[in-house]
Each structure stands twice: as structure tokens, then as C-alpha cells.
Amino acid sequence: MTLDEAIKSLMALQAKLAAYGHAMGLLFYDGATTAPKGTAANRGQTMSILSEEHYKLTTGGETVALLEFLDAHKSGLNEKQQRMVFLLIKDIRNMQKIPMDEYVAYQQLLVEADDVWHRAKETSDFALFEPVLEKIFETNIRFAHYCAPEKDPYDYWLSEYEDGLTMAQCDEFFATLREHIVPLLKKIKEKPQVDDAMLHGHFPEEKQAQLSDYLMRTMGLDLDHVGLSTTEHPFTTSLGSHFDERITTHYLEENFASSMFSVIHEGGHALYDTGSADDLAYTVLDGGVSMGIHESQSRFYENLLGRSRAFTGFVFPKLCELFPELSGHTAEEFYRAINKAEPSLIRTEADEVTYSLHVMVRYELEKRVMHGELKVHDLPGEWNYLYKEYLGVDVPDDKHGVLQDSHWSGGSIGYFPSYALGSAYGAQLLRKMKETVDVDECLKTGNFAPINAWNREHIWQYGCLKKPGALLEQALGEKFDPTVYTQYLEEKYGEIYGL
């Protein structure tokens, strides 16, 4: 085999893997959106067959031989090809350590888990979800031991979502946030509370859907390649490549802001994915490099831009057009209402000040379950205890507590810290962007093009070509510093509450 032939085979292999990913992604997306309730077992059967074929293709002798050949001749490969080979070998080595029957069974379990989670949340019954969740945690612990027996199992999964991330780093990061957020929240509680009554009323779903379309277009999303559906829990997924991106939202007719900011958040994810360089499509380099970087983009658009005074001033006339009852209010009142800082039950509805406390609860619980210090059966009680301790709120039921997120049903254990990291990354990226882009002026006129161009140049185009830490440092021109984020919060909320 010549090197040119091997490179062609490398590209063909990745196209096949992308095709399997496309098919399995469609099954997941269908299950979460429009599939009838009784079809989970049917999808699970198909998923098990596809995942088995995917496993065989990934770990097969031909694939291993091809990648070993390319690795031995990597001096003849360009930067992108070298990175492709590195990532594929990493994936193969991990997958080879997991018995195929266990891998396939786990994929089928996740299909079942998604269905059970929906039913459990609907009825607020954790006991229904408990047996499936126990299997998910047990499998994640077992797979971590297979892949990296020398590592702590929770460290292994943290690093899978954010390359190199450890519990020690998370502990230090969260300690820094707590040091600033807890006193800030205490000062806010001593001030008169912001009035957010204007956000509550009756806002027809049809009008909210029109707002979603408007927001997606304003953000610069290409609606020929990005679709929107409704689900119980909003998410974003790429199907096959960055040319087919799907986002979802959840409409609450009593609160239009819920979906508004879900769409902006998921739209940020979609901008990142669709911003990958086109020559990365159908390769392992396509899409976001880590969940921390991904969340830096989603929460950048949702909060740093979407909840800014400049953008709310721009979007408020459109809101009044869609919801005439808002016309008796001002853009400034809207800005203050959507930035009301107050402990709450639901992570996705949380303000910027308290949001990281929601993440810390999940981090602490995951860490303890992964170490055998907490039983899955005891998660609801411990969840409720930590919400009282961290946020001072009483959890009324499982639906508004331990069952609120879809992440555990999808096997995403170790994901949650990425949200808080992403918020902090985003604040530092915004500070850097403002050196060359008049961000406020862009937002006042609804012109996202210069903002998107900066993100595309510094973040999006690279896909998975660079490691997340290196990509971030290159974009920032300095080391990551979480106090940039806490300073942003202190300045913004200090002004809103007159601290």
C-alpha cells in the first residue's frame, strides 16, 4: 500500500464512520422529537445492529492495520491527517478494551433510558428511572476501568468531555467561583428584588415559534442546514456532518423567555458546529473539540450577548410586535427582568449568578456515585439536600429536582462541569473579542456578522484540529483565568442591583 492509497482509505473509513453516526444520530433525534411513545424497543433493536457494525468497522483488522501504517508514516502526512490518525487510534484503543457485547448492550440501554426518563419525569417518579440509571452509572464505571485502569473513573469521564480535565482542577475552579459568587449573591439578596412580572403571562406557542425563527436568522444561522424541533429538554446534534444540524426547544406558554434563551443557547452550539471548515466534513475533525469549548459558544450567545443591554434593546421592539402586552414596558425593564438573580429549582432557567451553583450540585453527586460513596437510590434525597444547602430552595418533587436533566439518561456523566467552564471561557473570549470588534454596536443593530466572523476565525473553523486548551489559549493570547468571569458577574450585577 502506498501512502496516497492509505490516505484515500483513511478518508473513506471516516466517511463510513460518519454514515453510521448519521444513522444512529437520526434514531436518537427521532426518539427525542416525533417518534410515537411505543417505538423505543424498535429503535433499540436497530441501534444495537448499527452499533455492532460500527464497533466492527472501528476495531476491525483492516482499520487497525491502516492506522498503524499511517502512524508509522506520519511524517508524510499534513497536520490535519496526523490529527485524524491520532484521534482514530485513541478511539480504537478505547473501544478495543470494551467487549463488543457490552458496547452494543450499552447503546441499546441508552435508547431505553431516554424513553424511561421521559416517562419518569412526566410522572415525577424517580423509582421508575432508578434501575436504568443504576445500570448507566455501573457501565460508566466499568468502561472507565477497561479503558484506563490506572485512572480514577470520574477523572476518565471528565477528560472525555474536556481533554485533560480532572477532579482536582474542577475543585479548584469551583472554589474560585464560590469565593466570588456566594458573597455576590448575599449582597444581591439584601437589595430590593428586580420585578420580572412582565415575563409571565400567556404567550401563544405559535408566536414563540415565530420568535425562534427570527432569533435564529438574526444570529446568522443558515436555516437550509439548521432545523428546529420541540422536545422535553432542549439539545443540539449534528447528523453525519456539520451540513445537517438540528436544535430543539421547549415552549412554555406562560413564559416566552424560557424558549427564547434556549433557542439562543442551542443556536450557539449550532453556529459552532456549522462553522467547521468544509474540508473537515465527514472526518473525525468535524464539529466541536470539547464540551467546554462547545458550552463557551452556547452560553456566550445566550448570556454574554443575549442577556446584554445592547441586544435586549435591539430585540425588544420585535417582542412587542409578537406579544403586544409587552408594549407597556421598556427595553430597560426587560433587560433587568431577564437578569433577575434569584435561587431557583431549574438549571436551564437559572440566572448567570446562581447557574454555577446548579452545576456544582450535579458535579458533587456524580463524583460521589462514581466513587461508591452515594447510591443511585439516594440521589433524590441528596439532590434535595444540596439544593437547600447551595441555593436555599426546597425541591417539591423529582420532576423539578433530580429528573430535570436528560444528561444522565444519555450516559453523559462528567459533562456538567463543562457548562460552568464554558461560561468562564466565554467571558474571557468576549473580553478578547472586544479588542477588535465593537460588540455593543453590533448587538444594538442586530448585526452578528462581525461577531460570528471573529468566532469562526479563532474557534469554529478548527473543528477538532487543535486540543481545547491550545485552541483557547491561541484565541485568548493568554492563559485561562476564571476570575475574568467572576469580575464580569460582579460588574454586571453590581450595576443592575446598585451594589
Residues of each region from the PLM?
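A well-structured
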Residues: 1-163, 490-499
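C-terminal, non-catalytic "cap/extension" segments appended to globular domains
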Residues: 2-3, 22-25, 32, 38, ...
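Divalent metal-coordination and catalytic microenvironments
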Residues: 10, 148, 265, 298, ...
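Active-site recognition of the HExxH zinc-binding catalytic motif
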Residues: 10, 258-277, 295-299
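Contiguous, non-catalytic segments that form substrate-binding/exosite surfaces or channel walls
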Residues: 106-258
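Inter-helical turn/loop segments and adjacent helix faces that build the functional surface
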Residues: 119-127, 160, 164, 187-196, ...
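All-alpha helical catalytic cores of prenyl diphosphate-utilizing isoprenoid enzymes
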Residues: 174, 178, 205-209, 215, ...
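Post-HExxH zinc-binding segment in Zn-dependent metallohydrolases
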Residues: 287-328
